């Protein structure tokens, strides 16, 4: 997973849990049942886990380009 993929995964899990929480709260408030809110947030968390935990291809679209290492010559000790 690259840096852009991490950013996308973070957006997905945050918005998934928030949307499921808000919808669950509204339906739970209308029905006067707190368990609906709890199960809605649990479902959102589970869906978020399925979407974000595996390293899907959509999270690996911007691979890192590493620089070549700089080879430094070892200093010689002339004081001996």
From Swiss-Prot:
Origin superkingdom: Eukaryota
Protein name: Signal peptidase complex subunit 1
One Pfam family from the record: SPC12
Lumenal face of the membrane: 31-33
PANTHER family, per database record: MICROSOMAL SIGNAL PEPTIDASE 12 KDA SUBUNIT (PTHR13202), SIGNAL PEPTIDASE COMPLEX SUBUNIT 1 (PTHR13202:SF0)
Keyword Transmembrane appears in the UniProt entry: yes
The keyword Transferase appears for this protein: no
Cellular location(s): Endoplasmic reticulum membrane
Underlying gene: spcs1
């Amino acid at each position: 997973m690259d840096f852009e993929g991490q950013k996308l995964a973070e957006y997905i899990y945050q918005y998934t849990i928030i949307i499921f929480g808000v919808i669950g709260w509204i339906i739970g408030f209308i029905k006067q049942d707190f368990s609906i809110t709890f199960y809605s947030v649990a479902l959102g968390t589970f869906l978020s886990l399925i979407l974000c935990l595996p390293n899907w291809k959509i999270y690996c679209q911007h691979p890192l380009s590493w620089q070549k290492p700089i080879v430094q010559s070892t200093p010689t000790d002339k004081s001996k």
